């Protein structure tokens, strides 16, 4: 017999994903890795089953617990992949390539053009992905380059090739947004180079563009390092809290042991006092019984000594017969 093919379930809806993220935000101290140190497996399992019940309440098809866990793992993987793209772009100075979800091409993707250096492609997170990023504690740095307006070169009739000048009305600026987990602290750094004089050689303009890109990359790198340090500090604080809780529990156990030892010492003292009282009572009883025992011994000795001198009646009769016979 042919085995019937398994029917594929429907994909998770937006409402189901929203419920999963909401429940994990509420129960992050039980289910998120850098919060749930020391949580027993029974509590984690109960929390996951609670999420499964809420998902099945709105789902069109019945979900199983492994499916919900797999969906949460996929969401985390997608968010971490985008954050890794930004980190690689900032640390390596290269723009992340296009992805299947972001599209094969478009503005802001690919390598940089011109002499101003490579530009960091923007990585935009949806509000749901931003919530997951905050929940995971990943620090994101999203660079949004602004538009640039450069007017064409204006040359007069008397201008020569050596004295060629350009008129620049707006210099490209780059604004960097930094988002940190659990604040949620958002701050923006914008750096605009100083305006150039109306008549500036083309070579000086190119050099100025190169120098303006480097400080911005340094600022982005510093912001990323500070975000990492803050995250490490939070993890360290969590470990310190756990150690403090363990120390408090050990102190409570030591106090309980000391109390039990004190109770045992009190019980031993009471037993010793009871033994002393018993010994005193026995000594008094012995002292009282000694004269009575002596009197009883004397009485017994007197009773055994009195019947010895009395004469035997048979001997008296025998002695009387000869007397009668003699008479």
Swiss-Prot record:
Belongs to the NAIF1 family. Residues 316-327 have a biased composition (Polar residues). Transmembrane segments: none annotated. It holds the Pfam family Myb_DNA-bind_5. Keywords: Apoptosis, Nucleus. Widely expressed. Its main location: nucleus. Residues 87-98 have a biased composition (Low complexity). GO terms for cellular component: cytosol; mitochondrion; nucleoplasm; nucleus; plasma membrane. This is Nuclear apoptosis-inducing factor 1. Residues 104-118 have a biased composition (Gly residues). The gene is NAIF1. Induces apoptosis. It is found in: Nucleus. InterPro entries: Myb_DNA-bind_5. Interacts with HARBI1. It comes from the Eukaryota. Residues 87-118, 303-327 are annotated as: Disordered.
């Amino acid at each position: 017999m042919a085995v019937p093919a398994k029917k594929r379930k429907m994909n998770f809806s937006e409402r189901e994903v929203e419920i999963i993220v909401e429940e994990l935000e509420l129960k992050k101290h039980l289910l998120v890795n850098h919060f749930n140190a020391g949580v027993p497996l029974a509590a984690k399992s109960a929390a996951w089953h609670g999420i499964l019940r809420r998902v099945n309440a709105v789902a069109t098809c019945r979900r199983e617990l492994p499916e919900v866990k797999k969906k949460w793992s996929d969401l985390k993987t997608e968010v971490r992949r985008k954050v890794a793209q930004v980190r690689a772009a900032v640390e390596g100075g290269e723009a992340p390539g296009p992805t299947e979800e972001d599209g094969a091409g478009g503005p802001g993707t690919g390598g940089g053009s011109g002499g101003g250096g490579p530009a960091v492609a923007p990585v935009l997170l949806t509000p749901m992905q931003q919530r997951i990023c905050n929940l995971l504690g990943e620090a994101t740095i999203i660079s949004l380059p602004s538009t640039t307006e450069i007017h064409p070169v204006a040359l007069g009739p008397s201008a020569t090739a050596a004295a060629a000048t350009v008129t620049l009305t707006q210099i490209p600026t780059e604004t960097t947004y930094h988002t940190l987990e659990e604040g949620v602290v958002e701050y923006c750094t914008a750096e605009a180079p100083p305006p150039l004089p109306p008549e500036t050689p083309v070579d000086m303009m190119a050099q100025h563009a190169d120098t303006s890109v480097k400080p911005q990359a340094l600022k982005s790198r510093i912001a990323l390092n500070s975000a990492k340090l803050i995250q490490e500090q939070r993890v360290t604080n969590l470990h310190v809290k756990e150690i403090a809780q363990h120390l408090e529990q050990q102190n409570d156990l030591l106090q309980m042991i000391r109390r039990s030892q004190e109770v045992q010492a009190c019980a031993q003292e009471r037993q010793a006092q009871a033994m002393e009282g018993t010994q005193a009572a026995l000594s008094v009883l012995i002292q009282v019984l000694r004269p009575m025992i002596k009197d009883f011994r004397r009485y017994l000795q007197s009773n055994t000594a009195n019947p010895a001198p009395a004469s035997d009646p048979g001997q008296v009769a025998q002695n009387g017969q000869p007397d009668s016979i003699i008479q």
